Amino acid sequence: MDAEHHDQPDLIVTQPWVRNQPTDIEHAIIIENKDTYQAMPTVEHAICILGNGYAATSHITTLLPWLTTIPNIIYWGDMDANGLDILSKLRTTGIPCTSILMDTTAYRTYEQYGTQLDAKNKPLTTQTPQPTPGLTTEERKLYETLCTGTDIQYLRIEQERIPIRDATTILHDQHHWPIDIPGNDIPNNNTK
């Protein structure tokens, strides 16, 4: 994301990144979906991490030990039971992240983009909510609703369906990210 590193290829971290680690990063966002990851604009002093679902919860603090020192860490995933479970697990691994677009208000705003199919196009089914100690009260409320299907039409809203401009506006306005948001310079990844 950072302009200084924007011309470099994406990095895949398979061993702890301790040498030549970035020292000027003030903002980090962990993204669940590759399309959204690729649509994120350049942002000074920021890094975008493709969490790739539950993969982010397994070894992120081992692979990126400096991540917890970044002052502003955001997680944005699918609005479904798995996405919220991933958020909970990230926090319980020691990542002090704030979520965006993962609460009941966001669900109601983007419900029109919902689906009843999982990532493999198989029908979603309701489930019994599990403990999620890393969620806030509002996030837990949405998690339970998405598990049980109570008073909602869809069990899943994919992250990539939400306009990227809406997310970057939230990052700018609510989390003070230095993102330029003039006109239509930020691509909209809502292509489905």
Residue spans of the language-model regions?
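Nucleic-acid enzyme cleavage-core boundary/entry regions
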Residues: M1-N72, N82, S88-L101, T105-K192
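Active-site glycine-centered loops adjacent to acidic/histidine catalytic or metal-binding residues
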Residues: D78
